Amino acid sequence: MAPPRPAAAESVQARGVHLVEEPGSDTLGIVVDLSREATVRHEVLVEPNRLVIDLENTVFAGAPAQGSNRAVGPVAGWRAGLFLLGRSRIVLDLNRPVLVQRTDFVRQGPHTRLVIQLRSASQDEFAGRAQEDQKRRFASRVPDGPSVPRPAGAKPLVVLDPGHGGIDPGASGPKGEVEKEIVLAVARLIRKQLEADGRVEVQMTREDDRFISLGERVVFARNRSAALFVSLHADSLFGEADVRGASVYTLSDRASDAAAARAAEKENRADVAAGLDAPEAQREGVDDILFDLARRETRLFSQLAARGVAQSIQRSGRLHKTPLRGAGFRVLRAPDMPSILVELGYLSNPEDLQALMQEAGRQKLAQGLAAALLDFVLNNRIAISTKPLE
């Protein structure tokens, strides 16, 4: 008889992050209150300089994502939250280079306090450590799995991509409403509508509050030979509360306007905000040729899908005054998979926010989007590559 399997260890509970300056010293202490000791790993990244602290098998109690933009010593700001299932992450943006000097666990009655002491470092020392950390990450990286070809006669696949998640909350509303929760809720409603119709298969890049990198989102859809990739987002422009309405984006090597360029720049920095390496600069030459040849048909189909979605939203909701836009979003760069990004509205606009927070408003929006996605996928098919994205 096989021995009983041990029960999974209960997650460590983290209760807040505190930055403590020491008077007369250039060092800084990071204090995290825990229910018990946890495995702690840390690394640094450059461009921009950041310190990343991972807590294994740990979840932050209370608010799922926390942070502050108030500068304290060498830290310009920080954020914390769930990074991967079973791992929480603290990311500190640095205004000068520092490294971890020591890590201690201090008992405080029934609880444990994690104390991480930082020390000043030169930029050369910091960059050298970042290079070592990067080599270690690459050595342990698991390659993407092979693509899974769609069997003959299979239903076309729609991949819904709720933006942000985990440590990355996305845009926020005036009372703490967060983009990551809104787009996940709308994605679930769209999936329900599509599954009820029964003519397409639906998968989601995330189904809970976890962080997924931009590249992983594209790989997820492309390796499953998706017929359409739909990334869902919401924006926020405080100080411009009159700006409202949904927009639909397709990939463009030149932004359609300044607002589109700003939106793409913000969304493309999601990985940096979560403590990942900044994306490498695009290679020139061959990639430019491949872009022109391989993407031409896909771009046309993406634009067709975008028009259909915009028309459907116009019938069921409120469009932005410039509803069809183009910009260089990283999640739209698959060369052989029609891809669109839908900004559902503005959390900084009272009318948009009300519609996105209420079940009736979400249902109405989801019904319109589902109808448009069905119309596109069932009536416009292109040959989808099964080559995995590298």
Region annotations inferred by a language model:
Residues 41-43, 62-63, 167-171, 258, ...:
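Short, solvent-exposed loop/turn elements at domain surfaces
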Residues 40, 53, 239, 290-390:
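Active-site-adjacent mobile loop/cap segments within catalytic or ligand-binding domains
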Residues 34-36, 55-57, 94-96, 116-120, ...:
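Flexible glycine-/small-residue-rich
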Residues 1-157:
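Signal-peptide-cleaved, periplasmic/extracellular N-terminal interaction regions immediately downstream
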Residues 132-286, 295-307, 315, 363, ...:
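Catalytic-core regions of hydrolytic enzymes
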